[in-house]
């Protein structure tokens, strides 16, 4: 039996800090972020199915979201303003991410590679599934901004403005439902939500 470093690499997601250029009241790592994105993506899929006539596998979407940033164990977390500074950088970084996804997949025992391929290789995801994971990713960044701003950290004001635009561009009925139903609580204290 051959040794595999796949899960040892995934365990390092907790060592990669998000928002590396921002002063944060509460730090966030890629592992924590991925779990929150999985929660939100699962909810978006369920909302789409129950409220807006969707037919998407919510559990599959949750697992896709768990792995959506897994390549960062090999690439690190490049700040969004850098990643999307211009189309050429964004295009080249996508190539780097794709190579990292392939390398990560190749770490698995061969007999399991096809089972993990749909989750580790982002190009294997359907457009509808990818859209929900991207929406959840943006919502989680937005919720982080709300939390930081509520704690008096104005460092996140511009990031929130940018995310307001991103959310408007990706707007769907299920996103509106989620944001109207769940987002306001992120601006409240523990006493207020208890």
Curated annotation (Swiss-Prot):
Annotated a divalent metal cation binding sites: 33, 68-69, 137
Entry annotated with the keyword Phosphoprotein: no
Residues reported to bind substrate: 18-19, 33, 69, 77-80, 137
GO cellular component, one term: cytoplasm
Catalytic activity: a 2'-deoxyribonucleoside 5'-phosphate + H2O = a 2'-deoxyribonucleoside + phosphate
Site (Appears to be important in orienting the phosphate for catalysis): 18
Subcellular location: Cytoplasm
Keyword annotations of the record: Cytoplasm, Hydrolase, Metal-binding, Nucleotide-binding
Keyword Transferase in record: no
Database matches in Pfam families: YfbR-like (PF12917)
Ranges of residues in domain HD: 30-142
SUPFAM superfamilies: HD-domain/PDEase-like
Cofactor(s) named in the record: a divalent metal cation
GO molecular function: 5'-deoxynucleotidase activity; metal ion binding; nucleotide binding
EC identifiers of the protein: 3.1.3.89
Assembly behavior: Homodimer.
Family stated for the protein in its record: Belongs to the 5DNU family.
HAMAP family according to UniProt: 5DNU
Protein purpose: Catalyzes the strictly specific dephosphorylation of 2'-deoxyribonucleoside 5'-monophosphates.
Name this polypeptide is given: 5'-deoxynucleotidase VV1113
């Amino acid at each position: 039996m051959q040794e595999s470093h796949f899960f040892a690499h995934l365990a390092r997601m907790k060592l990669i800090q998000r928002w590396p250029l921002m002063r944060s009241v509460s730090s966030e790592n890629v592992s924590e972020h991925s779990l929150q994105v999985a929660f939100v993506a699962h909810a978006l899929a369920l909302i789409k199915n129950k409220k807006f006539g969707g037919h998407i596998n919510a559990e599959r979407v949750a697992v896709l979201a768990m792995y959506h940033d897994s390549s960062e164990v090999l690439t690190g977390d490049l700040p969004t303003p850098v990643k999307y500074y211009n189309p050429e950088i964004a295009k080249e970084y996508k190539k780097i991410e794709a190579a990292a996804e392939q390398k990560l997949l190749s770490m698995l025992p061969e007999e399991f590679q096809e089972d993990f391929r749909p989750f580790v290789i982002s190009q294997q995801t359907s457009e509808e599934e990818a859209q929900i994971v991207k929406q959840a990713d943006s919502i989680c960044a937005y919720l982080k901004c709300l939390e930081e701003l509520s704690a008096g950290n104005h460092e996140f004001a511009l990031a929130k403005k940018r995310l307001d635009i991103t959310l408007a561009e990706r707007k769907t009925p299920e996103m509106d439902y989620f944001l109207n139903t769940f987002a306001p609580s992120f601006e409240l204290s523990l006493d207020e939500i208890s």
